Amino acid sequence: MPEPGFAQALYYQVSGSADAGQQAVAWALGAGADLRQLALVFDWCQDILTEAQSKALAAKLARGIQQSRRDSSLPMMRSRLLAAVALSGHLPDDPEREIDQVVRKWWEGQIVPALNSGREAVAREDAYALMEILHVVRDNFNQDLREGSPQFFTDLPMVDLLSCYPATFPAGENDYRIPAALHVGDQPDLRRAALSRAGELSMVAYDSNAPGSQILQGWLMNDHFLLRGTFGAPYEFLWANPYQPGLSYFQAPLVVHDSLLGRLFVRSDWDESAAWLGYFSGELQMFHDGAVTTLDPRSAAEQVDLKRAVIVFGARTRKFKVAAAGKEPVFVVGLKPRHDYLIEMDDEEMSEARSDPGGILDLDVPHDREAGVRLQPTGEPAKATARLEQP
């Protein structure tokens, strides 16, 4: 079993099985070293711990917090927070200091300012750890950490949904939707794919009434993707709510431009054979005919029309023509991040706009004819904290 402490402690909480609870405790007091799972066992199995076992496990959690203090990754900050919350009331002072360190100094002092200034401080693969932080803080302290960066969390469900490659991966236990990743290998990381789904399920559980959550719920409730493997099944059981109504993801937009962090995701339709483009973390990827191709937006010279959006590679293109059918948005990628540009459309009066933190510019072009566009960079790059100027 990949995560025996988590799985057995969860089973004990739900079923009351003393055998499962004792197995979780034995793992935690023995070879168990994963701080997150240790915290869950200590919290969920507290009523079957002897006094000696409780003290021993509390000491192990306290050591884990101290020994991991140099690791400031989001998953480890999550684990230390869970451990500190579990220890609260069992040890004096230290748990409260750790909670303050994670919530006030790290989240509010570092992560929120980074997100609001356009830095990608939360990686896609850390979405589940992020949601565990949100849940434990709200459940224990009645505080919603989303309030510090509302745009990031409003965009998160749709960014998460559109940043999956169109083709799914059939595994022995279930099918997987594969989240986009930098430096794609030959085989998908199915553990990462399972945690991606767990993160989506926990997003819905956190705020089931949010518009993005309702679409995400419709995306999740497909039996082919239920996590049935030994790693994923406990997460599915913990978070999935098949009785929660959702909206069909066919109603969701096929284009999402995250102007806060400078990311862009487009797919041509909802079929598994769809064409897909993703621009994130400075990398441009195309998915077509089941394969991912990485492109250099600074050297690519052609436009890409995915039926839902037109993408222009603008690093070397300062003058171009573009024809957008219907109401397709037009994006220029590969520009200088946070830089002011003069935009001249069909030799008419110029307007001014600013590229986002990823170097993406959303162009407002006429949709009834081919338009000639000229881009001219102007001025110095804007500061990271500057807001996007409207033309």
Each predicted region: which residue ranges?
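Surface-exposed interaction regions enriched in Ser/Thr/Asp/Glu
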Residues: 368-389
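Aromatic-lined, polymer-binding surfaces characteristic
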Residues: 1-158
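Extended polysaccharide-engagement surfaces of secreted carbohydrate-active enzymes
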Residues: 129-349, 353-367, 371-372
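Context-gated lysine
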Residues: 55, 60, 78, 105, ...
